[in-house]
Amino acid sequence: MKNVTDSFVSLGRWPSAGSFGLNTDILATNPINLSVVLGVLIFFGKGVLNDLLDNRKQRILNTIRNSEELRGGAIEQLEKARARLRKVKTEAARFRVNQYSEAEREKLNLINLTYKSLEDFENYKNDSIRFEQQRAIHQVRQRVFQQALRGALETLNSCLNKELHLRTISANIRLFRSMKELTN
């Protein structure tokens, strides 16, 4: 024990600066000094090191616990997302079938509507043709009637003399008088 104490005492007596020497005494060298320093450090630092390690252990355990909770939440969300995906796929398939059926219905409705529009257009065309024919027939009749009237007037004017003209007027006047008497 005396050597250990001597080694500590010798620490107080360092050689002066600028000199360097090699100490070959095993008891006075570094391995013993180091073991003492390490012993003191272990004895006094054990509590601090245990506290540090316990804190680190708690943080690691908390991190693991949080990770497990997050993992559980993520698995739960994944299952919910998968269920929603299945539901959406089912609805999409049903929607696709309904849309196909509705598209076919719309196509048939459009075909029927187009056919009806074509029928209406054909009827309108036929009505327009009939109207134009009636108008043309009416115009022809008016022209024929006007020409007949002109011809009759020309014939009457060429055949009528004053005497015939006066007799016609007198006959018409008598006719009107008799009509007037009948109405009174």
Swiss-Prot record:
InterPro entries reported for this sequence: ATP_synth_b/b'su_bac/chlpt
Gene Ontology cellular-component terms listed: chloroplast thylakoid membrane; proton-transporting ATP synthase complex
GO molecular function, one term: proton-transporting ATP synthase activity, rotational mechanism
Similarity section: Belongs to the ATPase B chain family.
Role this protein plays: F(1)F(0) ATP synthase produces ATP from ADP in the presence of a proton or sodium gradient. F-type ATPases consist of two structural domains, F(1) containing the extramembraneous catalytic core and F(0) containing the membrane proton channel, linked together by a central stalk and a peripheral stalk. During catalysis, ATP synthesis in the catalytic domain of F(1) is coupled via a rotary mechanism of the central stalk subunits to proton translocation.
Assembly: F-type ATPases have 2 components, F(1) - the catalytic core - and F(0) - the membrane proton channel. F(1) has five subunits: alpha(3), beta(3), gamma(1), delta(1), epsilon(1). F(0) has four main subunits: a(1), b(1), b'(1) and c(10-14). The alpha and beta chains form an alternating ring which encloses part of the gamma chain. F(1) is attached to F(0) by a central stalk formed by the gamma and epsilon chains, while a peripheral stalk is formed by the delta, b and b' chains.
The protein's name: ATP synthase subunit b, chloroplastic
